[in-house]
């Protein structure tokens, strides 16, 4: 098991035990590890694009979602919304840099993965209708139109 996967597993165990702060620490460590892997993806001999889009991007997205969940469980709503906004922008920038020169199947896969963050933002926005500052962050995600959308359509 890779270091980031171990942290996700330990974070999940902590979350299941209602130890949300501890879960957040594990999720953050796993996310940081994934973000450090990105430099290998941008090197002279990167892994295959299919692995990047079908393995790395979903892991990155799930890591942000796990961290957001742990922040919400601690009632740190602003922090969760900020993380979701950062996560969406990070995943979007990352995906866009790879899929512009990819085939339709990889573009579609990347868009499907990114839609998970948008879906999460929609669900969270419904719950936070009375928190305008949080809604602003979520609306940034909800209203983003990506280059990937334009390439596919």
Predicted regions and their residues:
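TPR repeat positional signature
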Residues: 7, 57, 64, 111-114, ...
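TPR-repeat structural position
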Residues: 20-21, 77, 84
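Short, charge-rich amphipathic alpha-helical segments embedded
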Residues: 27-55, 89-99
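Residues that mark the junctions of alpha-helical repeat units in TPR/alpha-solenoid scaffolds
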Residues: 3, 53-56, 60, 80, ...
